[in-house]
Each structure stands twice: as structure tokens, then as C-alpha cells.
């Protein structure tokens, strides 16, 4: 399977949630390019790890109302053995790794992907999202 951090380039849009308020940026727009550049900088040396986290739809939707979240939206299902139509990430600047929560078949249910950022953290991405 293609690395999950590379698949972000295939998204048709990204959604940014700030305290529950969502803004969507379509592929090809300036803000989409900014987000993708920050994502690529952050994940350039990342290592995909086995999934430890499990998402429960109702809890994820409730948590998404707090703080800043980024969601990649795809035209078709991707991911093979862990399929997804969207990938949701909680943006917390000091995190050095994070779950990518899979949305499939109408909900955020099941195992997550995990990216270890190695020596990096999420500051670059969080700063980008803060200044859109």
C-alpha cells in the first residue's frame, strides 16, 4: 500500500474544523496548496506505524467540535485492508505522532492509521491552519 502520508496529495479537498466550524478547500486552491505543503513538510520523514487507536463515531464527532482538526476528503474509497473515504487528524502542535482517523461507510469507526513524525512535531501544520 502507498504510504498514507503520500495519499494526501490525492485528496479532492481538505476540511478544517476550528471549534466545530468547518471550512472546506478544494484541490487546486491556494489554501489547499498551503495546507498540503505544511503537511508534506511535517510528514517528509514520518514513519507509518501499526494502528493502535480505534475510533468510535459518536465520540470522534463530539471531539471534533473542540480545537483544530484537519480532514482529507477523497473521491473514492482508498486504503486497501483499512479502507477510508476521509482521513481526520487532531491538530495539536506539540504532538510528535498522531492517529489518522478513518471515515468509511458513513462513520468514523474502527482502527486508525498512526504516523510517527520522528524528530518533528505538528507546529508547522497547526500554524498553517491557524493563519488561513
Task: Identify the meaning behind each predicted range.
Residues 1-132:
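Function-determining sites in protein domains
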Amino acid at each position: 500500500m502507498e504510504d498514507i502520508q503520500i495519499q494526501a496529495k490525492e485528496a479532492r479537498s481538505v476540511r478544517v474544523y476550528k471549534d466545530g466550524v468547518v471550512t472546506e478547500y478544494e484541490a487546486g486552491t491556494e489554501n489547499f496548496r498551503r495546507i498540503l505543503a505544511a503537511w508534506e513538510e511535517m510528514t517528509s520523514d514520518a514513519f507509518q506505524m501499526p494502528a493502535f487507536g480505534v475510533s468510535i463515531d459518536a465520540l470522534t464527532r463530539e471531539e471534533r467540535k473542540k480545537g483544530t482538526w484537519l480532514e482529507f476528503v477523497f473521491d473514492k474509497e482508498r486504503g486497501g485492508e483499512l479502507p477510508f473515504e476521509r482521513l481526520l487528524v487532531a491538530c495539536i502542535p506539540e504532538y510528535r505522532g498522531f492517529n489518522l482517523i478513518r471515515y468509511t461507510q458513513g462513520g468514523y469507526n474502527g482502527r486508525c492509521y498512526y504516523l510517527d513524525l520522528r524528530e518533528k512535531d505538528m507546529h508547522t501544520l497547526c500554524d498553517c491552519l491557524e493563519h488561513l
